[in-house]
Amino acid sequence: MKIQYLGHSAFYVEAGEMKALIDPFIPETLTHPIFSFADITHIFITHGHGDHLGSTLSIVRESNATVITNYEISLYLQSKGVNCHSMHIGGRTTMDFGTVKMTPALHGSAIETDEGLVCGGNPGGFVIECQGKKLYHAGDTGLTMDMKLLAVEEIDVALLPIGGNFTMDVQDAVRAVAFIGAKVAIPMHYNTFPVITASPESFKEQVKTSQVHILNVEEVYNF
């Protein structure tokens, strides 16, 4: 499995025939993406906030990708002509590339539109399994005891928010790593805005139970 960090909480994930984006809030300043939007097969949306729903609609128009998200966001996107696969918290499903499980998150999920707020259902995260590897994207979340249940998934790589204020801060993200037991932890959702300023180096220093890889924007990690 190959991932490329696209900034904030956005990642490109490639494994076999799957070429996916997670929470595509993607800066226009990207210079070396390892993918073409036209080739994207799937888009995972953890919740409805604009910094996670991102450029989903424009990417789908270019790629005809299937969006995997919760039921309420699916209804909203389907009203815009988007092909969606609906899930909900705790559900696991088999896709053509492997399996997906939707996990709990402590956050909000309202979708902001010109007409007002649209219900975005429950926020979540995803465990994506493909070619014998498991990737966990936590979405935006506070620390929760439910994360201890993820240890049974034997996750290879966990993508965890560390920015605080809206999500876990460094201290709680360190606890989350211990709960989850992933082989590798990668920090995300920090330093995009002043209110979520955090030190990934401090996170790395404090984690004792897993490897930590700090990815620069556009950096690629293979596992």
Curated annotation (Swiss-Prot):
GO molecular function, one term: hydrolase activity
The organism's place on the tree of life at top rank: Bacteria
Keywords noted in UniProt: Hydrolase
UniProt keyword Hydrolase, yes or no: yes
The keyword Nucleus is annotated on this UniProt entry: no
InterPro entries on file: Metallo-B-lactamas, RibonucZ/Hydroxyglut_hydro, UPF0173, UPF0173_UPF0282_UlaG_hydrolase
A Pfam family annotated for this UniProt entry: Lactamase_B_2
Similarity comment text for this entry: Belongs to the UPF0173 family.
NCBIfam families recorded: PRK00685.1 (NF001911)
Protein's recorded name: UPF0173 metal-dependent hydrolase Amet_4625
Biological classification of the source: Bacteria, Bacillati, Bacillota, Clostridia, Peptostreptococcales
